[in-house]
UniProtKB/Swiss-Prot annotation:
GO biological process: cell division; cell wall organization; peptidoglycan biosynthetic process; regulation of cell shape
EC number: 2.7.8.13
Compartment(s): Cell inner membrane
UniProt-recorded name of the protein: Phospho-N-acetylmuramoyl-pentapeptide-transferase
Similarity annotation: Belongs to the glycosyltransferase 4 family. MraY subfamily.
Pathway, per record: Cell wall biogenesis; peptidoglycan biosynthesis
Membrane-topology descriptor: Multi-pass membrane protein
GO cellular component: plasma membrane
Cofactor field: Mg(2+)
InterPro entries: Glycosyl_transferase_4, PNAcMuramoyl-5peptid_Trfase, PNAcMuramoyl-5peptid_Trfase_CS
Signal peptide bounds: none
Role summary: Catalyzes the initial step of the lipid cycle reactions in the biosynthesis of the cell wall peptidoglycan: transfers peptidoglycan precursor phospho-MurNAc-pentapeptide from UDP-MurNAc-pentapeptide onto the lipid carrier undecaprenyl phosphate, yielding undecaprenyl-pyrophosphoryl-MurNAc-pentapeptide, known as lipid I.
Catalytic activity, reaction form: UDP-N-acetyl-alpha-D-muramoyl-L-alanyl-gamma-D-glutamyl-meso-2,6-diaminopimeloyl-D-alanyl-D-alanine + di-trans,octa-cis-undecaprenyl phosphate = di-trans,octa-cis-undecaprenyl diphospho-N-acetyl-alpha-D-muramoyl-L-alanyl-D-glutamyl-meso-2,6-diaminopimeloyl-D-alanyl-D-alanine + UMP
Length: 365
């Protein structure tokens, strides 16, 4: 039997995926703490941060999800999407309102002495607020259209610009982070060009995670894995930022308890934009953009699939105004769904891909 056939025959449940991912990430974080000789109840313990974030989000979900259902904060499903998704209509959305605070609070308690941790928390909340505005407009107008794309993009650029201004005030225009580190000991001095790259990274990453948030447990699980991976990477040299990473990873794992297939709640733009904004901001302040590019390769793949789909459709548009599609549907996860993959098969594959990409960073280093 080929690998492809074996994968197609593997049909895990959402519960199995949740427990497997949570156990694997917790074991990896525990191992890193042991390697660095950090006790469980030390403020620098990444396992403590992960556990607190997880516990707060998991507990909060049992209160917030029924509340969202009572106020009729149900998701509107796109009619041109996979038909199997129509049954999800009415599932509460905006779950980021409990996942994000639950992930940030332990970080601020354990590592709040670091100004960088507060800056990361603020930029995460800024993107969560932009997402909340979009979610609220969708619920208010009872359709799948939130704030206008132009306004949304302007707000994303505004938040990125303000964050970069703060960094400039701390480090100057040509601070140490403007020379970005690369694999194999290489580096690249960008000087002033670093700042447009930083703004672009924040905006593009927040949109990439937003595009990835299309299946039960997909964005939450892969996002938690990337955050935990960044925490493991940064623990020796930047313990405060690593604590932030693991705390937020715990928040998304706790959210995943309620978002695993079949989902009781969706994170909405409130969670997905905040997730991407946080991951990008971490990579910027910790000077590990190449690590983000590799660990977050799935988010890049999802974004590229949309760009290629739109570009190909426009390039092949005929006199009737209709073009050809490169994929069955974009993003990539919907293409696989329409090819006969179940949701959990796609999610399991993407979890595996993300974990492999995270592991590959140590090989590249």
């Amino acid at each position: 039997m080929s690998w492809g056939q074996a994968l197609r025959n593997y049909k895990p449940t959402g519960q199995q995926l949740f427990f497997s991912l949570t156990a694997l990430l917790a074991a990896a974080v525990w191992g890193r703490d042991r390697q660095l000789d950090i006790g469980l109840f030390s403020p620098q313990s990444q396992l403590l941060a992960l556990g607190l974030g997880f516990s707060l989000a998991a507990i909060a979900g049992y209160w917030v999800v029924p509340l969202l259902r009572r106020i009729k904060a149900g998701q509107f499903i796109r009619e041109d999407g996979p038909q199997s998704h129509l049954q999800k209509a009415g599932t509460p959305t905006m779950g980021g309102i409990f996942a994000i605070p639950a992930g940030l609070l332990p970080a601020l308690i354990l590592a709040g002495r670091s100004p960088l941790v507060w800056a990361l928390a603020f930029v995460t909340l800024a993107y969560a607020t932009i997402g909340w505005l979009d979610d609220w407009q969708i619920l208010r107008h009872r359709n799948n259209k939130g704030i206008s794309p132009k306004l949304k993009l302007c707000l994303q650029f505004g938040a990125a610009f303000l964050f970069c201004l703060w960094l400039i005030s701390q480090q100057g225009w040509q601070g140490t982070i403007t020379t970005i580190t690369l694999p194999f000991g290489w580096s690249l001095a960008l000087s002033l060009l670093f700042w447009p790259l930083a703004v672009f990274t924040l905006v593009s990453e927040s949109n990439a995670t937003n595009l990835t948030d299309g299946l039960d447990g997909l964005a939450g699980g892969t996002g938690a894995a990337v955050l935990a991976g960044l925490g493991l990477w940064l623990a020796p040299q930047d313990p405060a930022i690593a604590t932030f990473c693991c705390s937020l990873a715990g928040g998304f794992l706790g959210f995943l308890l309620h978002n695993r297939n079949p989902a009781r709640v969706f994170m909405g733009d409130t969670g997905s934009l905040a997730l991407g904004g946080a991951i990008a901001a971490i990579a910027i302040v910790a000077n590990c953009l190449w690590v983000l590019l590799v660990m977050g390769g799935l988010f890049v793949l999802e974004s590229i699939s949309v760009i290629l789909q739109v570009s190909y459709y426009k390039a092949t548009k005929g006199p009737d105004g209709k073009g050809k599609r490169l994929l069955r549907m974009a993003p990539w996860h919907h293409h696989l769904e329409l090819g006969g993959w179940s949701e959990t098969q796609v999610v399991a594959s993407f979890y595996g891909l993300t974990l492999l990409l995270i592991a590959s960073c140590w090989l590249l280093n």
